[in-house]
Amino acid sequence: MKGKFIVFEGVDGSGKTTQIKLLGEKLESMGCPVVYTREPGGTRVGERIREILLNPLYGELVPWAEALLYAAARAQHVAQVILPALREGKVVLCDRFTDSSLAYQGYGRGVDIEMLEQVNRPAAAGVVPDLVLVLDFDREGQTERMARSGRSADRIEREAQEFYRRVRSGYLALAARAPRRYRVIDASRAEKLVHLDVLKAAEEVLDAFLKGNSRA
């Protein structure tokens, strides 16, 4: 694969969408071909699965059903979007990937981590991110802020603070397992400061790729 795969992870409200946009715009200004995508979603099938996963009407979803739906959306996403883009030499910026399943369904819901890894291995089809940016953020008070803004919380966002504390701890544990591939970034700071750290981490991974692209 000629492209690069950068994944943004973190609890809901950590600013992933904003930081993906900022990094993508910077890379595009440098002549880099960028693909923006997300999980669950990114494909027609994946977006329908996303509707089920995030709709509060389906609050009865049990943890394993939730985990398998995420894996199904991921398998479609990898085959239809991620792998083709990487083969074409593009930089794929993805909002969530396999670590979300481990953090949310594993650490958050208590689903066995090893079994989750076994399920997601074929779903990911051997694709491993070149860089995982974990935007570390304390979600305390986020539900109240959302209510004041007038936006209703989705099924996952309605979880209790203790759930999000477990998810956050899970992300930090995952990052500690492979520090060379992960960067934990304090997302509680100003947007511009977070972007500078994101850009620095991305440039370390993309250095040779960017040089090659500039010569093309």
Curated annotation (Swiss-Prot):
Catalysis performed (reactions): dTMP + ATP = dTDP + ADP
A GO term from the CC aspect: cytosol
Disulfide bonds: none
Keyword Cell membrane: no
SUPFAM superfamilies linked to this entry: P-loop containing nucleoside triphosphate hydrolases (SSF52540)
Entry's Gene Ontology molecular function annotations: ATP binding; dTMP kinase activity
Pfam families in the record: Thymidylate_kin (PF02223)
Residues that, per the record, bind ATP: 10-17
Highest taxon, organism lineage: Bacteria
Enzyme Commission numbers on file: 2.7.4.9
Keywords for this protein: ATP-binding, Kinase, Nucleotide biosynthesis, Nucleotide-binding, Transferase
Keyword Nucleotide-binding: yes
GO biological process, one term: dTTP biosynthetic process
Family: Belongs to the thymidylate kinase family.
Main function: Phosphorylation of dTMP to form dTDP in both de novo and salvage pathways of dTTP synthesis.
Protein name according to UniProt: Thymidylate kinase
Biological classification of the source: Bacteria, Bacillati, Bacillota, Clostridia, Eubacteriales
Gene name of the encoded protein: tmk
